[in-house]
Amino acid sequence: MTGMSNVSKLAGEPSGQEFLVFTLGNEEYGIDILKVQEIRGYDQVTRIANTPAFIKGVTNLRGVIVPIVDLRVKFCEGDVEYDDNTVVIVLNLGQRVVGIVVDGVSDVLSLTAEQIRPAPEFAVTLSTEYLTGLGALGERMLILVNIEKLLNSEEMALLDIAASHVA
């Protein structure tokens, strides 16, 4: 699905759509608030051997084994630090619960269809299929992410394997 068709899908929603705003480095991103289960501080995780660097490991969340993905590593943010501002956004993605590590969470914004622009097309070296679009609030730009497309099916399979090794 292209960014344009995602925008037209939102056009039928008169009150807009709410996004949880989080930061990675100096950039602000937004994900559909309805996917968010909870926000937690970053705790140490159980590392799983032979998984990509962006899969930090798993944690036990009230009896549920939750794979933890560091989006800063996935987006090649360079050296990442874990400090008091580092948080895990726990997402409910259909039949899966996944945690994503981000630099911080700032607020929840409601965007109307008019405030959401199609995702720009970049060179073939940069995949933009996971972008829903760009949210424009005056001078502020928000990169809207489709988290299911960001974590492709191959990566989701790795997360399932990681979680099953601990369960």
UniProtKB/Swiss-Prot annotation:
InterPro entries: CheW, CheW-like_dom_sf, CheW-lke_dom. One of its GO terms (biological process) is chemotaxis. Keywords: Chemotaxis, Cytoplasm. It is found in: Cytoplasm. Its main location: cytoplasm. Involved in the transmission of sensory signals from the chemoreceptors to the flagellar motors. GO terms for cellular component: cytosol. Pfam families: CheW (PF01584). This is Chemotaxis protein CheW. SMART domains: CheW. Residues 16-156 form the CheW-like domain.
